[in-house]
Amino acid sequence: MDENTVAVKVEEISPVKKKLLFDVPWEDVKRERDTIYRNFSRTAKIKGFRKGKIPRKILELHYKKHAEEETVSSLVSRLYWDALKEHDIRAISQPEIEQQGIEEEKDFSFSATVEVEPQIDPQGYLDMTLSKEEQTVTEDEVDGRLEDIRKMFGTLEEVTEDREIRKGDFVTIDFEGFIDGQNPEEMKRNDYFLEIGSNTMVPGFEDQLLGEKVGTIKEIKIIFPENYQINSNVAGKDATFKVTIKNLKEKKLPELDENFVKNFDKYESLDDLKEDVRKSLFEDHKRKTEADMSKKIMDKLLEMNDFDAPSSYVERQIFFMMMEARKRLITTGMDPAMIDQVSASWHDKYKDEATRIVKSSLLLKSIAQKESIDVTDEEFEERLREIARQYSQDYEKIKDSFNEDMKENVRNDILNKKVFDFIESKASVSMIEKEKTSPEEAN
């Protein structure tokens, strides 16, 4: 086929969508169809005829519909890919093909609509005015982290004194819930073990057990949150729970002294432990500060650069987010049928966030291209080594276990950080005092 005889017109439907219109001369269609029939002739089995010797009219009698479908498929596929190459179109979605089939002695017309990445000329990323929190570690934060470590080595002991329940206690309870006049099975539990203050239950449930004693039968009234994901059928509704308090335990913590340090091989003294805690907190603050700075930069960039996000990218991101959310719920032991019910509303819920993620990625990519920022092989290798160290794995095993998509994600993470660092290096950055936290918040 002489491709130059095929007329191709490109229409821009939107900044992220193009429509390719093809007009294929009848002679080219006929030639393609003849080729299809010749191929059929070599392989077709029709009673009374030898393979390769079947007359064309007999083939048409048996295979006309199939031959025309094959002709259309062959023409569309080849011409579509040739047109993308010729017009330098980088499609990011499967084409939406529109065609009416072949008509004898008539040119064959079809169209292919595809999504493309928007052409972005990034603005406003140079000379930004930004604020950054100082990276300091307070004694309250160190004390809070040490308290967390003590709790890891605490032991649960039954409370024998006649006292009220307080925050941090562990209770064993039976409960049943009533909503809309019903007493559903999923709102009943026996011997349920609960840490008061863990926020495991619906907001307000645990607070209403404070001050109560073992043996009490307590009526608790709550309102399910409007965005309650575990069961959307009860979201926003009033409910009453009948709770029987059966047992009370408290966690006894070890003294924070030199003897406590013997629980760890890597520390020789309490001061060593405190210093390591301080370093860990500093790294936590550093990561948080970088994340906060990246968000500030991204907020400004998105405000100054308005463009459409390709729907195929957004849908792909929504799908990924839904799968991750589903995995998290599966690990909680939630019934799959309940997960299906809950996830019905996730698509709309995640759409705005997914759109932001897609637009952010495209915008950072455009800045990287404009400023010739890329990821070197050395940077990629070093990041893989960091991942191996983080998970205490052999570097070669980590490297071999990463498929191409995973490697691309690592490269994108490195590239995004380099772009953020570049923007920050060109910005006017003022340091602000770190917001003070209480010991409870630090904990």
Curated annotation (Swiss-Prot):
GO cellular component term, pick one: cytoplasm
Coiled coil residues, start to end: none
Its EC number(s): 5.2.1.8
Catalytic activity: [protein]-peptidylproline (omega=180) = [protein]-peptidylproline (omega=0)
Any GO BP: protein unfolding
InterPro entries reported for this sequence: PPIase_dom_sf, PPIase_FKBP_dom, Trig_fac, Trigger_fac_C, Trigger_fac_C_sf, Trigger_fac_ribosome-bd_bac, Trigger_fac_ribosome-bd_sf, Trigger_fact/SurA_dom_sf
Domain PPIase FKBP-type: 168-254
SUPFAM superfamilies: FKBP-like, Triger factor/SurA peptide-binding domain-like, Trigger factor ribosome-binding domain
GO MF terms, alphabetically ordered: peptidyl-prolyl cis-trans isomerase activity; protein folding chaperone; ribosome binding
Keyword Transmembrane: no
Domain notes: Consists of 3 domains; the N-terminus binds the ribosome, the middle domain has PPIase activity, while the C-terminus has intrinsic chaperone activity on its own.
Family: Belongs to the FKBP-type PPIase family. Tig subfamily.
Listed name of the protein: Trigger factor
Source organism per UniProt: Syntrophus aciditrophicus (strain SB)
Organismal lineage: Bacteria, Pseudomonadati, Thermodesulfobacteriota, Syntrophia, Syntrophales
Gene label: tig
